[in-house]
């Protein structure tokens, strides 16, 4: 698998994110303006995200999936049953279809999404895992989960392990610096922000448990 193969695969996933966001919003039955109001962003940003003209930040993406009651898997991978007309698949169709899937995920097969502010997420599971987000996260030089002083919070608990680079983690008023081999765990309902503190890209393994039970905060 070449770097070009991985890039092309990611681009094909990226191209469908806006359509899936729009489908999820339509399914809930709210306007772009109303979603923007709930998230505290401009309606034009929602329009740009749905049209593929802008990338969401980590905070905005978490806010959107929470408000629309969808999982990250549904937005990144595309789930025809959830992102289509909302109708459940007939039982007889499920019984007739056989889709064996390996639990192994190779680097070139990861579902990935590029976010604003130099952040990239690659899913490390082959199938949708419900209330579990298991990702390989990359923070480019200067990359951050949210802009300065704009912390996010959501339901769940986070676990992280740094592979490369220096990752800054702010939790409330506390600041932590993680170097390769360091790990961290914290309650996601606490305001937090992740950012690259060094001069090389950060690579980390991140695990969020229970975010799907969220109610908007």
Regions found by a protein language model. Name each.
Residues 136-140, 153-169:
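Short, conserved beta-strand element in jelly-roll/cupin
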Residues 134-139, 185, 190, 199-215:
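A short hydrophobic beta-strand segment most commonly corresponding to one strand
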Residues 172-187:
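Short acidic-glycine-tyrosine-enriched beta hairpin
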Residues 78-117:
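Short, charged recognition helix plus adjacent turn
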Residues 59-74, 80:
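DNA major-groove recognition helix of helix-turn-helix/homeodomain DNA-binding modules
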Residues 19-38:
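Short basic helix-loop element that most often maps to the first helix and adjoining turn
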Residues 40-56:
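Recognition helix of helix-turn-helix/homeodomain-like DNA-binding domains
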Residues 107-149, 206:
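A short glycine-rich, His/Asp/Glu-containing loop-to-beta-strand
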